[in-house]
Amino acid sequence: MDRKHNPANTARARELRRDMTKEERKLWYEFLRQYPVRFARQKVLGRYIADFYCARAKLVIELDGSQHYIDTGPDKDRQRTEYLEQYGLRVVRIPNNAVTGNFTGVCEYIDLLVKEAVTSQGSPV
């Protein structure tokens, strides 16, 4: 990951941690915060800020609201994903409505992704 990032992103990440969406808040406080493998929220990764990041699993979780599906949203998301993937990170996009409508399924999916990634690296969860 290139170390050159916009210093304003650090302050912005702090703001985003303080002002999480209701879906981010739910996923963080009801699942990821206590998850046995550490996740960070609103993590600066190069020139981007990831919603949730698990270094051990090399996994980025992005929660996508409606703005991600209109205008330039899909193109920006594709650029972000390509940027992060070139550093060996897996980027997974989860729609906000999946968090509110199928929370258990979302948690099971994330759990599966983390376990697959960590065990493929040769260490138990």
Residue map of PLM features:
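Nucleic-acid endo/exonuclease domains
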Residues: M1-V125
